[in-house]
């Protein structure tokens, strides 16, 4: 809230200027893999459950990590596709953590199960972001996979049970905008403290939303 009294005090007794600081380095969102176990209808990378050519090997990823460190990049968000489909994802993540990066994991959450949660917790990701784009019916329609919502929410709960910082990521389009208040209620009900809200990247399969979203905002 803007307070005129505070503004007047600042005019009469300005706060001393703080020393200039170098701007922080960029956050790198790294799509390590295009493969995904889901085929979301709004996916910008047109991911699918198949192998795609031209992806980096483990050693090539390590070389890029060295380059990013030399460039003083402080934070990495490991994404995809579905990053948990990379067999070397935990090796890569541990390497990044050992190098001093802030390391986040951006996932659809369905692969956070009894077989993977131990490794996820051992890596100690600084943050796990799980995409939820509506309540059960809407989310499953987006994902084109019945049961995806429940699988993702189980992933959220497993992360919390293992002491990981976890939050929801919501991409708003004309198809799910009306459910935003219910998503906020879900955050409260599940005691989830972090929420990332974004617009759609109009690329790949998400390009078909360009016209309807523009009309919705008019």
Model-derived features with residue positions:
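Radical SAM enzyme [4Fe-4S]-AdoMet core and its adjacent flexible, acidic
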Residues: 1, 102, 122-123, 131-133, ...
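Conserved alpha-helical substructure of the radical SAM core
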Residues: 2-127
